[in-house]
């Protein structure tokens, strides 16, 4: 059960990292101040 949770977290993290990298390449300021971009 724990293994499933860990695998899910890893897949989510990798997915989020991919999205963040794409956003960062398009908008460099996203990494600098993500809060302003989200709100």
Curated annotation (Swiss-Prot):
InterPro entries: ORF8_betacoronavirus, SARS_ORF8_IG. Keywords: Signal. It holds the Pfam family bCoV_NS8. The keyword Chloroplast does not apply. Residues 1-15 form the signal peptide. Disulfide bonds: none annotated. The keyword ATP-binding does not apply. Residues 16-39 form the SARS ORF8 Ig-like domain. PROSITE patterns: SARS_ORF8_IG. This is ORF8a protein. It comes from Severe acute respiratory syndrome coronavirus.
